[in-house]
Amino acid sequence: MDKFVIVFIDDILIYSRTEQEHEEHLRMVLETLRKEQLYAKFSKCEFWLRRVSFLGHVVSEEGISVDPSKIEVIMNWERPRTVTEIRSFLGLAGYYRKFVQDFSKIAGPLTNLTRKDVKFVWSEECEKSFIELKKRLTSAPVLGLPDGTEDFVIYSDASRKGLGLSLIHI
């Protein structure tokens, strides 16, 4: 079931490619809930949605994207002036790192400022990093769902400044 269900605390999201597939997935989840004597309050359930906001993401037929309300928060984020503010920004930005190629490399100058032995000095490099992360997060792509019938290949690369991985669907 982990290929079509996301469970977070008391929220369950079931996603599928087709209506027929969704009917089967829904049946499987409801049977599992009944078998385990778990109950869903019908008035709080929504079925057959084509688009849903879930944990800061929008899931639709096109794929998964950043929730527009979060994009607005990122766009309006003012330049961090303390280590705490940098950590807060990196916390939000890091949650969406899967949408940003080279995230760790771009965030490096900001991450370095959060170290205990580093004096807080906002440099031009930090400013560029902050602006680039905001730009990339506010123009993030829609991530598609793999069809699961073909093979995957993992490409990796590492250096002293970052680590990169790509999962390629062939």
How would you label these PLM feature ranges?
Residues 1-168:
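Retroelement reverse transcriptase polymerase core
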